[in-house]
Curated annotation (Swiss-Prot):
The gene is btuF. This is Vitamin B12-binding protein. Keywords: Disulfide bond, Periplasm, Signal, Transport. The lineage of its organism: Bacteria, Pseudomonadati, Pseudomonadota, Gammaproteobacteria, Enterobacterales. NCBIfam families: PRK03379.1, TroA_like. Cyanocob(III)alamin binds at Y57. Disulfide bonds join C190-C266. Its main location: periplasm. Residues 1-27 form the signal peptide.
Length: 280
């Protein structure tokens, strides 16, 4: 007879059990988010009603627009943060300046750092935020739903014919992504092959000639649909390939909404035929 503890739990019961095991002695009551991505993570993890301030451009969900701004590209307003008396700060390790964060940490304020480089780490961040949330079950459920969605996309597009993909950011100068970013992983999820995946730096500056040498079959940009015509014109007449424009906020933020960009990209990538000469 199988021991009781070895019976597999239904998924909902497993999530509830994890929530009970990670329930903090005291959840955070006054939370400050220092990037749009961590603001979205906070809401997804059930911390939205505990936010007292956020960064500039924290515009999702709608209620985030009503919150005070204490950080921007110009820096972090340490004095104002201290006046708000937070018991938790959510920071973006790759984007927020470290010195003011060190000052805040030295004063005893807990800081949660988020800087996913792999798409699965977004779910991990949600699970970790559960310990601070008054609704830990919401954080764990959001993480589980995220993982399920990722697996669904992986299964659906695993057999797609690979397409050499150029991730384009800007034109003058021209930047792209290496294989060590969330954006590159989204491309891989949809059957694309990042032509600069082998770059040693995360966001290399490249030349027009370097791009053409690697012969991309599709170009991916973030922005509105109007970007498509501009990017297509930029490469004429030497390079004529499909251009896919993804919602900028979905694609560039390390939050659950990046899967909306993934779904958008996968659908459009799948509709692009592989050139006959390269399909064998």
């Amino acid at each position: 007879m199988m021991p009781l503890g070895l019976f597999p739990l239904p998924r909902a019961a497993a999530v509830l059990l994890i929530s009970l095991l990670t329930l903090p002695a005291q959840a955070a009551e006054r939370v400050i988010s220092l990037s749009p991505s961590t603001t979205e993570l906070a809401y997804a993890a059930g911390l939205g009603d505990k936010l007292v301030a956020v960064s500039a451009y924290s515009d999702y969900p709608e209620s985030a627009k009503k919150l005070e701004h204490v950080a921007s590209w110009q820096g972090i307003n340490v004095e104002r943060i201290l006046a708000l008396k937070p018991d938790l700060i959510l920071a973006w390790r790759g984007g927020n300046p470290q010195r003011p964060l060190d000052q805040l940490a030295a004063l005893g304020i807990p800081i949660f750092y988020s800087d996913p480089t792999h798409i699965d780490q977004i779910a991990s961040d949600l699970d970790k935020l559960a310990q601070y949330s008054p609704h830990p079950e919401q954080a764990h459920q959001a993480a589980e739903q995220f993982r399920q969605h990722v697996n669904t996309l992986r299964d659906r597009y695993a057999r797609s014919q690979p397409k050499r993909t150029f991730l384009q950011f800007g034109t003058q100068p021209l930047f792209t992504s290496s294989g060590h970013t969330l954006q590159s992983e989204v491309v891989s999820l949809c059957g694309g092959e990042n032509i600069f995946a082998d770059s040693r730096v995360p966001w290399p500056q490249v030349s027009r000639e370097q791009v053409m040498t690697r012969k991309p079959q599709v170009i991916v940009v973030s922005g509105t649909q109007s970007q498509v015509d501009n990017v297509s014109a930029f490469w004429l007449p030497q390079l004529v390939v499909p251009v896919i424009a993804l919602n900028e906020d979905w694609f560039n933020r390390a939050s659950p909404r990046i899967l909306l960009a993934a779904q958008q990209l996968c659908q459009q990538m799948a509709s692009i035929p592989t050139p006959v000469a390269e399909s064998h």
